[in-house]
């Protein structure tokens, strides 16, 4: 008998497995696709690899203004091969860790027979606990027209060649990333969002800033717009367009079998499986983590949920805390947000940061929010925003006062100095802005 059977080896499942196994638990992981889940195989890793390559192309194209002349030619077959090699290397790393910790990996599709029995490849696995970590899948687009043109945020990585033009449907974080990356790699891009601004659910000023930068890069951004695909025609509002590919980026949905859950008596809704703060379902020995739990579709949240579930299975009381979840969007420039965007706020422009000027990219800003002398939230738009947000996340988590960060000496010249200057601005003591 296993102590735990985990279904799914994505960032939730594999982290949970390792957290359990290193404490001596007998763990079996069932995975029907590749190790690392959507994040490694079809999400975070391949998109960020392409984002890095797009950044190289962008810098090479802008190098002439710095006195560096170069001709840019993209061989997508090589780029794609290197991307897949990176994915394979990281997935292999997870497999290596499984062997190191004695975690049994079974390839196949799991069928949950009871809360103590899982069937895989006609073999029954008996277990004390079950962890569901089956992730999510892209939402489909309600159209039967032009199937040869439509790709999802998963299937786009299977394309052998870069399309000349792409219509991206959905201006959330995934749609904005793909629009930016594909544009950087030379594709003509239309980006359509039904809501008033890009990145719906986030402060409008952020979506507006990204829209401005995208338009400057030549992307056709259409917020508060509708799309219709019918009779072999693609209409944005009343305008007909003819993209080579149509990328559907309208979100994801939990990947579970509702009939199976109902038979087991596990509570769920359209957002995901219902869990408590310990990641338990209504069946005390069945846990749900990652996208399937429906809280956040973020790999770093999934991994943390995996650790929390593991600790509770091991008898160490642990609860999820979602108050300081960083949210990053890998556009050009990047966006990073953490905490509450409310209270007294001040903004510091990246153009006043020395390192941003050295990098040749001064777009964006750092905006900080405080209440009763405690840092509440931070918004960063700019080069390497995803790297800077970690310090803000820690400061908010520890309930630090702005002066606690200000009185910490920061290296110069660095981008995090912009965070310090923004904090100084809260009481009018900024050094590098008026």
What is the predicted function of each stretch?
Residues 5-7, 110, 125-135, 168-169, ...:
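Short hydrophobic core segments
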Residues 1-12, 162-172:
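Beta1/beta-strand and adjacent pyrophosphate-binding region of the FAD-binding site
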Residues 12-16, 38, 150, 175-178, ...:
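Short glycine/serine/threonine-rich phosphate/pyrophosphate-binding segments
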Residues 2, 18-25, 30-162, 190, ...:
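Glycine-rich flavin
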Residues 2, 7-33, 45, 49-56, ...:
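Flexible, glycine-rich terminal cap/loop adjacent to redox cofactors
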Residues 209, 289-341, 412, 416-434:
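A conserved FAD-binding loop/helix module that cradles the flavin
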Residues 147-163, 241-312:
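FAD-site-proximal beta/loop scaffold in flavoenzymes
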Residues 44, 134-188, 192, 262-264, ...:
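Glycine-rich dinucleotide-binding loop and its adjacent helix/turn
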């Amino acid at each position: 008998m296993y102590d735990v059977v985990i279904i799914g080896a994505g960032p939730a499942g594999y982290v949970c497995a390792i957290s359990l196994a290193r404490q001596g638990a007998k763990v079996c992981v069932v995975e029907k696709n590749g190790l690392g889940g959507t994040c490694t195989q079809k999400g975070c890793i391949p998109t960020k690899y392409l984002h890095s390559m797009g950044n190289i192309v962008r810098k090479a194209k802008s190098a002439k203004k710095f006195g560096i002349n170069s001709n840019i030619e993209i061989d997508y077959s090589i780029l794609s091969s290197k991307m897949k090699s990176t994915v394979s290397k990281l997935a292999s790393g997870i497999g290596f860790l499984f062997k190191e910790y004695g975690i049994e990996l079974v390839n196949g599709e799991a069928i949950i027979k009871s809360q103590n029995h899982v069937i895989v490849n006609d073999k029954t696995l008996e277990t004390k606990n079950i962890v569901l970590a089956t992730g999510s899948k892209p939402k489909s687009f309600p159209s039967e027209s032009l199937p040869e043109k439509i790709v999802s945020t998963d299937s786009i990585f299977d394309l052998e060649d870069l399309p000349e033009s792409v219509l991206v449907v959905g201006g959330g974080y995934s749609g904005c990333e793909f629009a930016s990356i594909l544009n950087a790699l030379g594709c003509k891009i239309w980006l359509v969002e039904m809501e008033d601004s890009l990145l719906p659910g986030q402060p409008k000023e952020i979506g507006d800033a990204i829209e401005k930068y995208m338009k400057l890069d030549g992307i056709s951004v259409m917020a508060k717009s509708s799309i219709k695909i019918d009779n072999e025609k693609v209409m944005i509002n009343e305008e007909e367009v003819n993209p080579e590919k149509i990328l559907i980026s309208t979100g994801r949905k939990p990947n579970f079998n509702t009939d199976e859950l109902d038979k087991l008596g596990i509570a769920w809704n359209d957002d995901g499986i219902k869990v408590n703060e310990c990641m338990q379902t209504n069946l005390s020995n069945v846990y749900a983590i990652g996208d399937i739990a429906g809280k956040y579709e973020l790999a770093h949240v999934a991994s943390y949920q995996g650790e929390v579930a593991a600790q509770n299975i091991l008898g160490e009381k642990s609860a999820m805390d979602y108050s300081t979840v960083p949210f990053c969007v890998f556009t050009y420039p990047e966006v990073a947000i953490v905490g509450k965007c409310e209270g007294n706020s001040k903004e510091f422009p990246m153009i006043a940061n020395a390192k941003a000027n050295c990098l040749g990219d001064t777009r964006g800003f750092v905006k900080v929010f405080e209440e009763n002398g405690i840092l509440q939230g931070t918004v960063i738009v700019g080069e390497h925003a995803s790297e800077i947000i970690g310090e803000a996340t820690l400061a908010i988590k520890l309930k630090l006062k702005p002066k606690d960060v200000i009185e910490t000496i920061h290296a110069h010249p660095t981008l995090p100095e912009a965070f310090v200057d923004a904090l100084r601005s809260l009481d009018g003591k900024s050094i590098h802005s008026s």
